């Protein structure tokens, strides 16, 4: 694990994988996940020529909490990290609930971000019909996200279950997943990464989880304002964030390309890891 002491005194935890001198890509992990989320076979990342940097958001893993954080005030943390690593331009990748953070970085650092890749993304929740494009659990957050005491109670419950028995927690998470995801995580190496990532997410309790919910109430920008090229990958069988959500997000982004993986689920990022990473080597300046 690597850490950076930010200007305001907080700690930012990150990891680096892949090719040391490869194309830098900063990954935004999903909701209830951590910097440990990546394909466990590092050879694939090396072969793709990618220097992958994964980061714990505030309250997750080893990164200090940041009460009241938003998508936009996450950007200075990433900017400081890129400066520390002496990275001028870079790509941004995300999975699931990491997508608003990826787009926020593209919005605020448009002169430094050359490409954005979103996999199984969540779109804005404050639009008509949003609840029709996601699992009922996200519908709950959409409906009650403004009730902070209720969300804190829900977050503490999530953290307690994850910290008491991570294998059981992962089983329950996957129970309602489509068959492609269940098959994917039958691979024990992937399953261990999955469990390790979620266990790390709740290391400090529910701070990260709760912070993500509160941040999602208001993005602070619109997809129409993103001028960076965006590639979206989504599985047709995703039952957490439906493919229609990714398609609608692509329609709102000025320079987006949407690719559907037929017969794949929410975690198609791991099955198609190499292809997704290769997106960053296309049309490099």
Kindly label every feature range from the protein language model.
Residues 226, 232-234, 238:
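Short beta-strand/loop motif that positions the catalytic acidic residue
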